[in-house]
Every structure is written in structure tokens, then in C-alpha cells.
Amino acid sequence: MVKHSFIALAEHASKLRRSIPPVKLTYKNMLRDPSVKYRAFAPPKMVKRIWPDKTIQKAPRWLSTDLRDGNQSLPDPMSVAQKKEYFHKLINIGFKEIEVSFPSASQTDFDFTRYAVENAPDDVGIQCLVQSREHLIKRTVEALTGAKRATIHTYLATSDMFREIVFNMSREEAISKAVEATKLVRKLTKDDPSQQATRWSYEFSPECFSDTPGEFAVEICEAVKKAWEPTEENPIIFNLPATVEVASPNVYADQIEYFSTHITEREKVCISTHCHNDRGCGVAATELGMLAGADRVEGCLFGNGERTGNVDLVTVAMNMYTQGVSPNLDFSDLTSISEIVHRCNKIPIPPRAPYGGELVVSAFSGSHQDAIKKGFAIQNKKQAQGETRWRIPYLPLDPKDIGRDYEAVIRVNSQSGKGGAAWVIMRSLGLDVPRPMQVDFSNTLQKNADALGRELKSEEITKLFKETYNYNNNEHIYVTLLNYEVKKLNPERRALVGQVEINDKVVNIEGYGNGPISSLVDALSNLLNVKLSVQNYSEHSLGSGSATQAASFINLSYIKDINNHATSNMWGVGVSEDTGDASIKAVFATVNNIIHSGDVLLAE
């Protein structure tokens, strides 16, 4: 029969089949051959790479540039009040280096720099960016005067494209300009006797480093280093930015390793990364850059910044965390951090953003939900035995570590399976729903989700479960047990006698079976004049200690249509401090549900 139906279906499909020609690409705007317009980036020639065999073992120095690079890229920059709130949040997260402004650009930036200087903890360094111009450098030093720790950050574009197109500057002129700026910063800071109360650090960025020939990047930084004369205790910071991401992350790692192995006095140098995300690889480039020798990472929370943004510091830090390496940053309340970033930047955090997105710890797929539910069941057992390792399918991070709860882990829509609903019921009612009942409830849920055309909320799922299975016999009460007694006839035979109330009348009942439940079901079969049979029964304890209760689940089959002997079945749930009472509640919940369905009619 099945074979013939498949054949008929195939024949029908064959008749309907029509030829669909391949789609021809029009290339309305894109080029058929992009090589006539774009050239592949030429990577540095590396005889031997060390970084591919390394792993990240410790946290880098972190610098947040949210208040400078991030803020300057906002359509509507932060207010002073928002900057202050953001500044203190960065400190509370654990950032020890914060780039707060471009103080020579405006009085507002200058004033905020003064606020940061006066309100930063002693162990937090305040950094400011400045162009390599004398009057701007002097203004920046003025803004930072009095800080416990301060870093002046100068920069100069070093790529051939920028030197030739934007600045019309030779390599020699670029080196001279960078050295001149460095000497001036030195004169006004660490060499000035009146500035000795501040620990002055210096950062130089060969801007567009990722598009700069490696040997020239080293050459200009050597000249800057010689002019600054760093120490091991206070190394010079060479920030090597992917100002525009021009190649794959492995190429950036090669560039970092080349610089790290060719710069002299490496112990007096701190190599910093500052990756933008033009190709979508900012995090990967940063991580490979650390493998290649970078000591420090600059970026923004959730990747704010010019164009496609800077590297997302949350992702880099939490990637380390989930590999067992402490990032020395505290994202325990990532939800509140996300709220502040969203509100101050006026840019929403994508719901799928790693770690911070609303949906990153949520599973809608049925197979995912089932795996997660099983993972938690095993995890709970192992934790009771002293195991601390986190090992849950599809969840590389314990949501509680970032302040999320487990309620958000499993979400139910029309695509969800039985595991998702079972998880919600376990979390809301404490019930470990038996697998056959999960399948039954899943069908009910999917129909509801399809009808609504949206995700079902946890409270909606719980309400639907209670209504569907007459939870604890609290709905649709047609038959009520008044009293009963079970007598032992022989080792395998029991008799139940009792009274029920039905249609406002007290009726005697009597039934037989191998135990109390089967005897009660037999008695109700006689009462309703329909054959009821126990198809599935399970129970488990609920809670612990003096508050322990019992939960019982029962599935009863019955003849739905006496003419063709069609059968159906229904589930019910009962909860009570007494196991026997829970079982009885489950039976009556099921029977009353059957009556409510209209499949079985009460006698007048």
C-alpha cells in the first residue's frame, strides 16, 4: 500500500515537472572580473613562522578607546554625562588603560580629560590622542597634567598610499616628523622636572600599519624609540593598527611577528594591536596578533568605531575566558554593560552579537534543545559529585557567568521540539516530564505557535501545560473522589471500594487490579462504562528535604468510538506530598480531561 502511494506521488510529480533554466548573473554593479579593479594584498615574506604553534596563555594589557575612537565615530556623540557614566563603567569592568579623548580638538574634550584625570583610580592610566603638531601636543600635555598615570599617543600615516596621496611625504620626511613630535612630548613630560609626579608613557602609531611595508614600519619605530629612550619598567608602546583591514588575519599575524622579531630592544617595547573590522575579521586578527607577539589590545566594547568598527573587546576577552584563561576583565553583569553601551552610543547591540546579544544563549531548534536539556541533567549529577568543569552541548559559556539566567536558554516556537517545552516545564514547575508525554505536548505547542505565528513565552507554555493535562486536577472537574479503601485479596490481587461525587450525586465505586492505581482505573471504567487502560505511568520526587513532594504522570487509553473500536489516549499530572495521593490526582486529572473532551459522556 505504502509502495503504491509513493509510486503515485512520483508519477504526479513527474507530470508537474517543468524546466527551470539556470539563473544568469547580471552583474549590474559588481564586476565580472574584479581583478581589473582590485589587487590582492602582497603579504610579507616569512621564512619561518612561530605564531601558528602558539596558544594564548595570559591576558594582554587592555586599552578601551570607546570614549575616543568609539565616540568620534558616533552620528550623535555622547554627552558629558554619558561619558562620565561610561568612564566609570570601564573602570568597574577592570580596564587599567583608557583612551578618553582628543583634548586638543575641543574645549569639551579638554574638560572631560580633566575630569578623567581627577577621578581616575591611582592604577588607571589616562591616554589621549594627538596629531604630531607642536601646539596640539602642548594642549594635550596641559590636559593630562596632574594625572597619576598618563599616556600621550601620537600617530603618523606610514603606508605608501597615505604618504603619497594624502600627505605627499617621503619616508625620510615621515621619520623626521615622527621623531620631532616624540622629542617634544619627551621634553614636555618625562624630562620636565615639574611633571615628575606623573608616570608618563608614550605611544606611537604608524597609522595604516597593515598596509605599510614591514621594513619601513620597523625603521620609523626604531627612530621614535631612540628619541624616547624607554625602559623595561616603562616600555614604549608601538601600536600597530589595522587602520583599514586589507588582508586575512594570518597576514596581520605575519606582520606583527615580523615587527616583533626585527625591532631592537624588544624588552623595552610593548606591541599593541588596534584592529578594525572592514573584512569582518577584527577578533581573529587580534587573537592571531597576540599569538604573533602583541602584548596589548586596543578596541571598544561590542566593536564600536569608524566604518565597520574596532575589534570587540568583549568577544576577545570572553573567548579567552571560555578557554580557561582569565582576561582580568569582569563581565559578570554583561546585560547592564550592554544597556549602557546601547544607551550611550545610541546603536543597538545585534541580538546575535557574541556573548552580549539577546539571543546568544537561546536555542529554538528542537535537536539543540534536547541536547542542552540532556547536558544539564548530566551536569547537575556531576556537580553533585564535585565536578566543576562546564560541559553543555551548544553552550560554550555558562550563561550565569555573564549574569544571564537559564530561563533564556531554551525558547519555544513552531520549529522547536519536545526538549524545549520539557526544559521550560522543568524550570517553571519542577516536573521532569516523561518522554512520551513530551512528544504529546510538543504537538500541542507547535499548533499553538503556528496559530500565533510567534515564539511562545515561558509563562504561556506553563499555562498551556496546566490546561492541557489538567495539572493537579484543578480544571474540568466532573468526577471527584470522596473516599476509598484498598483491600488485599491475595499477593497479586487488590480490590478498591469508595465513593465519588458525580453530577452532584454520591456514587459508590468498586474495581480490581494488581495495585491501587489499576484498581482505581478499573473502578472508573465501570463507572463511566468505558474501558480505561493504563498505557504509561511514571513518578519522581519534587524538591528536597521537608518540602519534598511527589509528581505522578499517567496516560490512559480508552475506546473513542464504540462502533469501530477506535482508541485514543490522554495524559494527566498530579502533585502531592503523598505519593499515593499524587497518583490519584493524576488519574482523576486524566479522567476529567477525557470527559471534558466529549469522547466519553456522563450518564444522566
Swiss-Prot record:
The major lineage groups are: Eukaryota, Fungi, Dikarya, Ascomycota, Saccharomycotina
Give any single GO term for biological process: L-leucine biosynthetic process
Which is an annotated GO molecular function term of this record?
Answer: 2-isopropylmalate synthase activity
Which keywords describe this protein according to UniProt? Amino-acid biosynthesis, Branched-chain amino acid biosynthesis, Leucine biosynthesis, Metal-binding, Mitochondrion, Transferase, Transit peptide
One GO cellular-component annotation of the UniProt record comes to: mitochondrion
Disruption outcome: Retains 79% 2-isopropylmalate synthase activity and grows in the absence of Leu; a double LEU1-LEU9 deletion has no 2-isopropylmalate synthase, does not grow in the absence of Leu.
Q: Which InterPro entries match?
A: 2-isopropylmalate_synth_dimer, AIPM/Hcit_synth_CS, Aldolase_TIM, IPM_Synthase, LeuA-like_post-cat, LeuA_allosteric_dom_sf, LeuA_N_DRE-TIM, PYR_CT
The note filed under miscellaneous reads:
Present with 28800 molecules/cell in log phase SD medium.
For activity, the cofactor(s) needed are:
a divalent metal cation
Pfam families, alphabetized: HMGL-like, IPMS_D2, LeuA_dimer
Q: What is this protein called?
A: 2-isopropylmalate synthase 2, mitochondrial
Kindly report, in one word, the top-level EC class recorded for this enzyme: transferase
Transit peptide residues according to the UniProt entry: 1-50
CDD domains reported in the protein's UniProt record: DRE_TIM_LeuA (cd07942)
Organism of origin is: Saccharomyces cerevisiae (strain ATCC 204508 / S288c) (Baker's yeast)
Major location (coarse): mitochondrion
- State the function annotated in the UniProt record: Catalyzes the condensation of the acetyl group of acetyl-CoA with 3-methyl-2-oxobutanoate (2-oxoisovalerate) to form 3-carboxy-3-hydroxy-4-methylpentanoate (2-isopropylmalate). Redundant to LEU4, responsible for about 20% of alpha-IPMS activity. Involved in leucine synthesis.
